[in-house]
């Protein structure tokens, strides 16, 4: 398995496989890998002959400098896991390689509207950083297919729109969220939880499931539903950051034409862990 921070070295390896007619899959990550990331890799292997993984903690998408500094970096362990999964190459660029002129003068890619909805409204510039780095990585790897987790629902929607709008010849595959046995979505952020907080954390998914059960019958009372859900989270020890219930396709408020909604949850637990989760709900489902 090749591990390189050099663009030319990575492209040379990819070129060899392309010349052999092989299909290339790509999984972009920020490292600190867990089974959720490895599930993306395994799904990528189902769609291609060669899997490329990137590990890059992208400074452009962090809105708080301390979060960038404190983000866990576990490169040796990550590479060991990826080698076990049969990954062909791991791209580990530095910020200087990805942004040689610095961030201030870097050309950026911005997906209109969706970049500033919901999570984007709370984190200005975050999704611009995501779309820019993913575009750069796509240009470097030029994959046939790329895999992203559905846990970051808005990010996946943004990438799909960007690829469609820019006519990139890349198939985007959304991979279902991987959960622990108690329902907690796997996330690098879970490492910030204390033992006591870890016991509380599955409540986020439970409250989300409760909203999903209530929603088909309460589509005209969404503000009250959100308030009740936030009260449940706060009573359990969370600090609710956001609960949004929007059209699953457009991420805009529900309308009479909406057939599916997505529940987007974000809440702080303790001082460091901001947990997110989501659930798609069929609004035409028969209510019990």
Swiss-Prot record:
Its EC number is 6.3.2.1. Beta-alanine binds at residue 61. GO terms for cellular component: cytosol. Keywords: ATP-binding, Cytoplasm, Ligase, Nucleotide-binding, Pantothenate biosynthesis. Pathway: Cofactor biosynthesis; (R)-pantothenate biosynthesis; (R)-pantothenate from (R)-pantoate and beta-alanine: step 1/1. One of its GO terms (biological process) is pantothenate biosynthetic process. GO terms for molecular function: ATP binding; pantoate-beta-alanine ligase activity. Coiled coil: none annotated. HAMAP family: PanC (MF_00158). Catalyzes the condensation of pantoate with beta-alanine in an ATP-dependent reaction via a pantoyl-adenylate intermediate. This is Pantothenate synthetase. It comes from Tolumonas auensis (strain DSM 9187 / NBRC 110442 / TA 4).
């Amino acid at each position: 398995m090749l591990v390189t921070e050099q663009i030319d070295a990575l492209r040379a390896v990819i070129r060899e496989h392309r010349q052999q007619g092989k299909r290339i899959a790509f999984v972009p990550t920020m490292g600190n890998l867990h089974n959720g990331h490895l599930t993306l890799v395994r799904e990528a292997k189902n769609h291609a002959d060669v899997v490329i993984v990137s590990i890059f903690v992208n400074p452009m998408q962090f809105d708080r400098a301390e979060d960038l500094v404190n983000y866990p970096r576990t490169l040796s362990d990550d590479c060991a896991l990826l080698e076990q999964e049969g990954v062909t190459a791991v791209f580990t660029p530095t910020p200087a390689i990805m942004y040689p002129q610095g961030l201030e003068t870097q050309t950026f890619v911005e997906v209109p509207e969706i970049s500033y909805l919901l999570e984007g409204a709370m984190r200005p510039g975050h999704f611009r950083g995501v779309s820019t780095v993913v575009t750069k990585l796509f240009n470097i790897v030029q994959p046939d297919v790329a895999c992203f987790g559905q846990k970051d629902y808005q990010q996946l929607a943004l990438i799909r729109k960007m690829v469609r709008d820019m006519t990139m010849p890349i198939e985007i595959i959304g991979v279902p969220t991987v959960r622990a046995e108690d329902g907690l979505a796997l996330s690098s952020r879970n490492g910030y939880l204390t033992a006591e907080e870890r016991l509380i954390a599955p409540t986020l998914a439970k409250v989300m499931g409760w909203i999903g059960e209530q929603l088909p019958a309460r589509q005209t009372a969404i503000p009250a539903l959100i308030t009740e859900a936030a009260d449940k989270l706060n009573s359990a020890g969370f600090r609710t950051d956001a609960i949004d219930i929007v059209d699953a396709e457009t991420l805009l408020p529900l309308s009479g034409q909406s057939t599916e909604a997505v529940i987007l949850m974000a809440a702080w637990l303790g001082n460091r862990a901001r947990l997110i989760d989501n659930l798609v709900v069929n609004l035409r489902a028969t209510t019990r």
